[in-house]
């Protein structure tokens, strides 16, 4: 964590200690000054149920208790049923055992990510001609339908869920958040990529080699991307900004390089990371998105898929990778595993009105219904702090940028160490100045002055 710059006026405001107390004060400060503390650990999971299929979430610590100032939960859209009480949640003995997968799989496949953000198909009608050929062994769920998500996955009732409402004025400006680094996102036309209607979203499977860094030692590789949208006249982004919902939202899901498989990373702090960007209406067609939207007719039915040429994945995201909000949350669909690092870009992506209509009015979901309004209601922060890489509001048209308070992302221990460090520096300078003065006085005191003797000579 980058320390705050010390004030240049602070030494002038602290008087130098008296000569007799200098050594005592210096020794006292040496005993008090601690080693610079490490940054407080990120929030642990609230219960062993929060790990989804992994079932290995860390328990909620006392430091994770929510504050009194939680963001209000908005009225649920057709993406979430009311959460059951604690008595409705199954115990640990109800969780299914995780069956290890074959070690013969050499590389990550989409099957390794059965329910990350856009999971596999729910129960499909028997007359669906485009049933998934690879099968679907996951629990069935849908937006706005039974069963309630916490019964599908108990982690969906966790305390640190996503999406959330972002309030720029309450975001903590954190200079340590550096511009994101993307490598290998410009894909050649071949090999082609799989574009699929999984009944919950349109999902593009990404090949190996797409790397992303959130900072030193925080490297990830991209697995897939998908979209969330609304309906005609009804916006459908998952995250909101001060209650404002955008027409659509793109998610690019990444796996930490510290894990070989997705099921190992589920529920682990920082195991998964998602890049999110808001989509809104603009005057011109977006050529990058048109490469995908023009193929939606081919996958209109649930479970159908097609092959599309490789494209520049970074062109689907905003051009400014330096301005974003970041917080720790969860997957926004079952299993709702927590520990996911969310990076929500400040800049939006423009699509034409026709393209947004194509996105929301082409695909079909479960039960021969339109695949629309596939977003989850915003969840309470429960004491979490959203960090910002910039000290400004959201640059989204037609919404004007708004100033935010420069809240510090430093922990209390960091600030305490900084204060003691400044006091130590000031005392050291005062001690050196005092020693120098005493040295000068001692040197002058050793000189004896004798009056000049005038020898009288005879005339």
Swiss-Prot record:
Residues 42-154 are annotated as: Disordered. It comes from the Eukaryota. Residues 96-112, 129-140 have a biased composition (Basic and acidic residues). GO terms for cellular component: basolateral plasma membrane; membrane; microvillus membrane; nucleolus; plasma membrane. Asn-346 bears high-mannose type glycan structures. Residues 1-37 form the signal peptide. Residues 38-112 are annotated as: Proteoglycan-like (PG). GO terms for molecular function: carbonate dehydratase activity; molecular function activator activity; zinc ion binding. The active site is at 200 (proton donor/acceptor). Gene3D superfamilies: Alpha carbonic anhydrase (3.10.200.10). Zn(2+) binds at residues 226, 228, 251. The modification Phosphotyrosine is found at residue 449. Keywords: Cell membrane, Cell projection, Disulfide bond, Glycoprotein, Lyase, Membrane, Metal-binding, Nucleus, Phosphoprotein, Signal, Transmembrane, Transmembrane helix, Zinc. Expressed primarily in carcinoma cells lines. Expression is restricted to very few normal tissues and the most abundant expression is found in the epithelial cells of gastric mucosa. The keyword Membrane applies. Residues 138-391 are annotated as: Catalytic. Optimum pH is 6.5. Residues 38-414 are extracellular. Residues 139-390 form the Alpha-carbonic anhydrase domain. PROSITE patterns: ALPHA_CA_1, ALPHA_CA_2. Its cofactor is Zn(2+). InterPro entries: CA_dom, CA_dom_sf, Carbonic_anhydrase_a-class, Carbonic_anhydrase_a-class_CS. Catalyzes the interconversion between carbon dioxide and water and the dissociated ions of carbonic acid (i.e. bicarbonate and hydrogen ions). This is Carbonic anhydrase 9. It comes from Homo sapiens.
């Amino acid at each position: 964590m980058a320390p705050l710059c010390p004030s240049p006026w602070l030494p002038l405001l602290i008087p130098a200690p008296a000569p007799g107390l200098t050594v005592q004060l210096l020794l006292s400060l040496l005993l008090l000054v601690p080693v610079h503390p490490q940054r407080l650990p990120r929030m642990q999971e609230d219960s062993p149920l929060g790990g989804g299929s992994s079932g290995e979430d860390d328990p909620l610590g006392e430091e994770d208790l929510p504050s009194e100032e939680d963001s209000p939960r908005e009225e649920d859209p057709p993406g979430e049923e009311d959460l059951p009480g604690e008595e409705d949640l199954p115990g640990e003995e109800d969780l299914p055992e995780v069956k290890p997968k074959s070690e013969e799989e050499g590389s990550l496949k989409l099957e390794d990510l059965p329910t990350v953000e856009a999971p596999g198909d729910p129960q499909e009608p028997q007359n669906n001609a485009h049933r998934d050929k690879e099968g679907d062994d996951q629990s069935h769920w849908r937006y706005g339908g039974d069963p309630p998500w916490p019964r599908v996955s108990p982690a969906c009732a966790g305390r640190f869920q996503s999406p959330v409402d972002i309030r720029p004025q309450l975001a903590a400006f954190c200079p340590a958040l550096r511009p994101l680094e993307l490598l290998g996102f410009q894909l050649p036309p071949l090999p082609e990529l799989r574009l699929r209607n999984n009944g919950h979203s349109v999902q593009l499977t990404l090949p190996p080699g797409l790397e992303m860094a959130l900072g030193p030692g925080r490297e990830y590789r991209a697995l897939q991307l998908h979209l969330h949208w609304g309906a005609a006249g009804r916006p459908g982004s998952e995250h909101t900004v001060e209650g404002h919902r955008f027409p659509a939202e793109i998610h690019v899901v990444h796996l930490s390089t510290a894990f070989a498989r997705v099921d190992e990373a589920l529920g682990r702090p920082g195991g998964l990371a998602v890049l999110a960007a808001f989509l809104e209406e603009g005057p011109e067609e977006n050529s990058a998105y048109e490469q995908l939207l023009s193929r939606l007719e081919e996958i209109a039915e649930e479970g159908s898929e097609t092959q599309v040429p490789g494209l520049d994945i970074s062109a689907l995201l905003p051009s400014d990778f330096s301005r974003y909000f970041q917080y720790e949350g969860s997957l926004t669909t079952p299993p709702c595993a927590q520990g996911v690092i969310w990076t929500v870009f400040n800049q939006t992506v423009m699509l034409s009105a026709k393209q947004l209509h194509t996105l929301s009015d082409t695909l079909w979901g479960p039960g021969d219904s339109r695949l629309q309004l596939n977003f989850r209601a915003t969840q309470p922060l429960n004491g979490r702090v959203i960090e910002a890489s910039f000290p400004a509001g959201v640059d989204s048209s037609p919404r004007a940028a708004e100033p935010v308070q420069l809240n510090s992302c430093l922990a209390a221990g960091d600030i305490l160490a900084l204060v003691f460090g400044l006091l130590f520096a000031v005392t050291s300078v005062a001690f050196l100045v005092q020693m120098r003065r005493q040295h000068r006085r001692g040197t002058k005191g050793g000189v004896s002055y004798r009056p000049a003797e005038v020898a009288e000579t005879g005339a």
